[in-house]
A protein has these predicted regions:
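Lectin-like carbohydrate-binding module/patch detector with strong preference for beta-trefoil
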Residues: 2-4, 8-217
Length: 217
């Protein structure tokens, strides 16, 4: 199992055929349902209310920052919905370490290598805080920092566990709702930041490749 997980991780990072990679990743992840999300894992985040996946592609916003757009995508089989979970640059966390509630994380879009980002620009449809993708390998700032908040009594992030991601700079929670983009196909909906805690702020780690927990001390 460990070998197959690592092989799938390599395929994901090298950008293998999207359909085959998606199918293989889902098969691997279903076998380890409920395991811990670790740094270096490549996962899809599912919005609890609408079941859309957090998604991005190399298409800029037509307003606000003009940075790479982020949306909610209704289809499961799409390789543009994979995100690599990374620690903050000044953290001592290593690949394979479990992630506790309160940790500051970054999410790197697998395909474009840009970071999930937010700032004070208004989002296109609702006028909330814009969420974009920005930067790249070796280019990251505090606008890419998100604090993990686990719902309930859990202390360590696991697959299928309800979580919120709160943007460190703006205080906005990663949020989505059923406001749809007309110019984007496939029923894509707005992702934005909202400072209030709402049911629409809740996400779950879903399909993906979950790296084994690092047991070394």
């Amino acid at each position: 199992m460990a070998a197959s997980v690592l092989a799938l991780a390599v395929a994901l990072l090298l950008g293998g055929a999207s359909y085959g990679v998606d199918r293989g990743a889902e098969a691997a992840s279903s076998a380890v349902e409920g395991v811990e999300v670790t740094y270096g894992s490549t996962v899809k985040l599912m919005h609890e209310k609408t079941k859309h996946r957090l998604h991005s592609h190399d298409v800029p916003y037509g307003s606000g920052s003009g940075q790479q757009s982020v949306t909610g995508f209704p289809e499961v089989d799409d390789s543009n919905s994979y995100w690599i979970v990374r620690p903050a640059p000044d953290s001592s966390a290593k690949q394979g370490d479990a992630i506790e509630t309160g940790s500051i994380i970054r999410l790197q879009h697998m395909r474009t290598r840009r970071w999930l980002h937010s700032h004070l620009h208004a989002s296109p449809l609702s006028g909330n805080l814009e969420v974009s993708c920005f930067g790249g390998d070796g280019q990251s700032d505090t606008g890419d920092y998100w604090r993990l908040e686990i719902e309930g009594s859990g202390k360590v992030w696991k697959r299928d566990q309800k979580v919120r991601l709160r943007h460190v700079d703006t205080g906005g929670y990663l949020h989505s709702h059923n406001k749809k983009y007309n110019r984007l196909g496939g029923g894509q909906q707005e992702v934005c930041g909202v400072r209030e805690k709402r049911a629409e702020n809740i996400w779950l780690a879903a399909e993906g490749v979950y790296l084994p927990v690092n047991e070394s001390k």
